[in-house]
Amino acid sequence: VFPNLFLVNWKIDGEGKPVVRMINPTPSEIEDLIQLRLVGFNCRRYDNHIMYARLMGYTNEQLFNLSQKIINNSPNCFFGEAYNISFTDVYDFCSKKQSLKKWEIELSNKANDPYSKMDDEVRALCKKIKHHELGLPWDQPVPEELWTKVAEYCDDDVIATEATYKANLGDFVAREILAELANGSVNDTTNSLTTKFIFGKNRNPQSEFMYRDLSEPVTELPDDALAFLKEAKPEMMAEPFHGPK
């Protein structure tokens, strides 16, 4: 996102599928795009909201200002409806948290190492990754003759996102399992799914937590806690308890 340029690059999953470049797409073009199952990288915290803003009619300048607010962690710059534009977020479901650029370097190095263990399809995809810097100031308008250069830079990020997704399919399978157990979606965050799995639909589970005064000795246990401990730790609970002296 630049003051005068808004690019959306994407591709259909699979070998040989070309990257589609959308230069300053209209709201109707974005509306058509979000009908697809979109997989992005950190899209829940950035891309989804930029695309949703365009869908709502934001101009390029307004998109740029929104982008700066998101990057600078400004409050009240996210759209609640935008989070679920994507099918899933690669950054969030990956157990290893690092930037896309670091994934580009790591996967490219691994793909070019003949002794590394990697699926042939993933290796071929990773070898296409070209890590380079754009070399243009992000806060300045881009001359129209350089728009293709910027689009090519975005192509690399699309390929890197697909490669990162396929190189971490094990993590995605784990996300699918967690989503099923929690009755959620693969686009929900790991944190929200874990919370939902443990506490269900209770949004204020703290009210059910068991608190006690740690400065006071334990003289007795509630029946449910006692039953749980006897089942979970029978050997420990078989020991005689004489209480505090």
Predicted regions and their residues:
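Gly/Thr-rich phosphate-binding beta-strand-loop-beta motif of the actin/hexokinase/Hsp70
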Residues: 1-11
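A short, structural micro-pattern
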Residues: 2, 32, 79-84, 191
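N-terminal, helix-rich and Lys/Arg-enriched segments in bacterial and organellar proteins
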Residues: 8, 41, 46, 234, ...
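Nucleic-acid-processing active sites and adjacent nucleic-acid-binding tracks
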Residues: 15-32
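Active-site-proximal helix-loop-helix substrate-binding element of RNase H-like nuclease domains
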Residues: 18-20, 38-53, 57-159
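Conserved "right-hand" nucleotidyltransferase catalytic core of DNA-directed polymerases
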Residues: 106-114, 121-245
